UniProtKB/Swiss-Prot annotation:
Location, primary (coarse class): cytoplasm
Top-rank EC class of the record's enzyme: ligase
Stated family: Belongs to the class-II aminoacyl-tRNA synthetase family. Type-1 seryl-tRNA synthetase subfamily.
The protein's name: Serine--tRNA ligase
Pfam families: Seryl_tRNA_N (PF02403), tRNA-synt_2b (PF00587)
Species this chain originates from: Methanosarcina mazei (strain ATCC BAA-159 / DSM 3647 / Goe1 / Go1 / JCM 11833 / OCM 88)
């Protein structure tokens, strides 16, 4: 969340930021209107409360002198009535202001490229060369079904479309990747945590999922939401706290839940975009002056997984029109998917400046007074999409799949996945 005072004093800066995000400036116009009315009511209310104190003393003095205080009492009643009216308006305006403030996205960093959509995202670097196949590669869902390691039919039977059952070596591959990713990241200096995935509304608001993305979330009847990403519970671990000993680096595995499956035509099959998926997350809490340096390091930490798996990928810098709601700057890691002949997102690494920390009230102490920390996070990585990349990039002509060398110790020494005849 932005600071109200900043928006009030810099409407042009905020307005330009919204325009760069393909938004209008109506939110700012409404905010300034409510803010002016709110402050006007505050001033009038303070003046009337001061006047009420004066009249109260006058009434007391008149009664003490046995004089008629009726006119002053009538005046007091009018003052009290107006104060109540103003208090109601103040609450109403404040509610409207808070609602708008929660709906205003972060201001993009000066280093975030300006653009309209993903077509304007510049490529930062390309790592590895896409494999040249001597046969026609199969899509991951065909590989998974032919090897009997992915079952979409039975998943649909119990949960509907947009789910998958991992079986045998498929389940082992998923589990191996989670453990491998966590091991790599803990060696990089991240502390592993295992948080709840049922999240309350306050925490969801703290990281920016609510109110804007409510329709994309799975809500429960008792006020909880299923975590759409481990970013939410991990960042909110320090909600309403003063943090000591910055920086703090955390990594976590969780299942994630989103309603987005089926929104993208080419992803209606397979496991690229499901309602439920696993992800390993990286989260950093840092001092403001180091946050952009830490973003570069976090991105490299996420990239390390792809390098160790020897998967070809590229890094792109998201432009203003493609930037997430809470982010000031984002790098996307995109892995090569052979059957689509293009790179697909497998991680987003973002610096949120103090946007999330202000919403979640995460601060640290300085000699000048309390300050909001800067938060960063990134996927390290989306596990299902990593399975997609392995199945497609490591497939063989005979239908088997080679297991990346770094994963073999996590899979009992197995070097390949072949269909098991029961």
């Amino acid at each position: 969340m932005l600071e109200l005072k900043f928006v009030r004093n810099n409407p042009d800066i905020v307005g330009r930021a919204l325009i760069s995000r393909n938004m209008g400036t109506e939110l700012i116009d409404s905010l300034l209107e409510y803010d002016a009315a709110w402050r006007e009511c505050l001033i009038e209310g303070d003046d009337l409360k001061h006047k009420r104190n004066v009249v109260t003393r006058e009434i007391a003095q008149l009664k003490k002198e046995n004089k008629d205080a009726a006119s002053r009492i009538n005046e007091m009643q009018g003052i009290n009535s107006r104060i109540k009216e103003l208090d109601d308006k103040i609450r109403d305006y404040k509610s409207k202001i808070n609602e708008i403030m929660l709906s205003i996205p972060n201001i993009p960093s000066e280093t975030t490229p300006v653009g309209k959509d993903e077509n304007d995202n510049p490529v930062v670097r390309v790592v590895g060369e896409p494999r040249e196949f001597t046969f026609t590669p199969k899509p991951h869902w065909e590989i998974g079904e032919s090897l009997d390691i992915l079952d979409f039919e039975r998943a649909a039977k119990i949960s509907g479309q947009g789910f998958a059952v991992y079986k045998g070596m498929g389940a082992k591959l998923e589990r191996a990747l989670i453990n491998f990713m966590l091991d790599v990241h803990t060696r990089q200096g991240y502390l592993e945590v295992f948080p709840p995935v049922l999240i309350n509304e306050k925490a969801m608001t703290g990281t920016g999922q609510l109110p804007k993305f409510k329709d994309d979330m799975y809500g429960c009847t008792d006020g909880f939401y299923l975590a759409p990403t481990a970013e939410v519970p991990v960042t909110n671990l320090f909600m309403d706290e003063y943090m000591e000993n910055l920086p703090v680096f955390l990594t976590a595995y969780t299942a994630c839940f989103r309603r987005e499956a089926g929104k993208h035509g080419q992803d209606t099959r397979g496991i690229i975009r499901n309602h439920q998926f696993n992800k390993v997350e990286l989260v950093k809490f840092v001092m403001p002056e180091t946050s952009y340096e830490e973003l570069e390091k976090l991105t490299l930490d996420a990239e390390e997984i792809l390098k160790l798996l020897k998967l070809p990928y590229r890094v792109v810098s998201l432009c203003t029109g493609d930037l997430g709601f809470s982010a000031a700057k984002t790098y996307d890691l995109e892995v090569w998917v052979p059957t689509q002949e293009k790179y697909r997102e497998i991680s987003s690494c973002s610096n949120f400046d103090n946007f999330q920390a202000r919403r979640a009230n995460i601060r640290y102490r300085t000699p000048e007074g309390p300050q909001f920390v800067h938060t960063l996070n990134g996927s390290g990585l989306a596990v299902g999409r990593t399975v997609v990349a392995i199945l497609e990039n490591y497939q063989r002509e005979d239908g088997s799949v080679e297991i990346p060398e770094v994963l073999r110790p996590y899979m009992g020494g197995a070097e390949e996945i072949r269909k098991v005849c029961h």
